[in-house]
Amino acid sequence: MGKLMAPKILVTNDDGVYSTGLKAAFDSVSDLGEVTISAPAVQQSGVGRSISIFEPLRITKTDVGGIPAYAVGGTPTDSVILGIFTILKQMPDLVLSGFNIGENISTDTITTSGTIGGALEAASYGIPAIAASMQVLDEGQKFDDPRDYHRERFEAGIKIVNKIARNVLRHGMPENVDLLNINIPYHAEEDTPIEITRLARKVFKTDVEERRDPRGRSYYWIAGDLIREEEEGTDVHAVMQKGYVSITPISLDSTARIEFSEIEKYL
């Protein structure tokens, strides 16, 4: 009888290849199979599922805490595409995107998060995908150097993601689920309760700050405060109010669940 092949796992992120969160993601699945890292060379937060089609991409071999890795001069989606079609040259059994430094909750982040964007790209090929994010208490930490973020903050998340990834590899995804979006609260322990949630509508109260440069010309920062109170059963409520781990099953199919006759009225 032939020897069973170890599962192939691709790891990516949006904070850049040298983020401590990426090393934590590697550690969370390192005992589950043959792990390859393909991640953006630099910070790519907020790029969503964007893809580079007007410029060439380069891949640089590097290492993450002594682990061989590939740094891609592009987005998380680029990193997944090159990881699959150029580096691995085959479909992996699982793609893990994370750990993001900062929570990715609500519909706000599904279309803007590079962490989730990379996972969605993998899911579009039928690959089981997990996006994992770690809550920060100080929103300013999202803009600090991700190489300096405290390694110990990921310990509980590593164990939680390991268990979930192990079961995804063993059983596959449930029907109509393409991606599991996991958010770990800042003070999580291994026994922190886990809640299966739906997406909240919003997590940001969007604002725009106008400032003036030395020549008196206006420039702008997109900003806003976090929404911490949302309906029971949402990811925002679970993470922000209860301090629970949130797991939200996501489908690529964004078609509204309505009778099409409702739209025909507009024709």
Swiss-Prot record:
InterPro entries to which the protein is assigned, alphabetical: SurE (IPR030048), SurE-like_Pase/nucleotidase (IPR002828), SurE-like_sf (IPR036523)
SUPFAM superfamilies: SurE-like
Keywords (A to Z) from UniProt: Cytoplasm, Hydrolase, Metal-binding, Nucleotide-binding
Known cofactor(s): a divalent metal cation
Catalytic activity: a ribonucleoside 5'-phosphate + H2O = a ribonucleoside + phosphate
Subcellular location: Cytoplasm
Hydrolase listed as a keyword: yes
Residues annotated to bind a divalent metal cation: D14, D15, S45, N100
Gene Ontology molecular function, alphabetical: 5'-nucleotidase activity; metal ion binding; nucleotide binding
Enzyme Commission no: 3.1.3.5
Source domain of life: Archaea
Family: Belongs to the SurE nucleotidase family.
Function in brief: Nucleotidase that shows phosphatase activity on nucleoside 5'-monophosphates.
HAMAP family tied to this protein: SurE (MF_00060)
Protein name per Swiss-Prot or TrEMBL: 5'-nucleotidase SurE
Biological source species: Methanosarcina acetivorans (strain ATCC 35395 / DSM 2834 / JCM 12185 / C2A)
Gene: surE
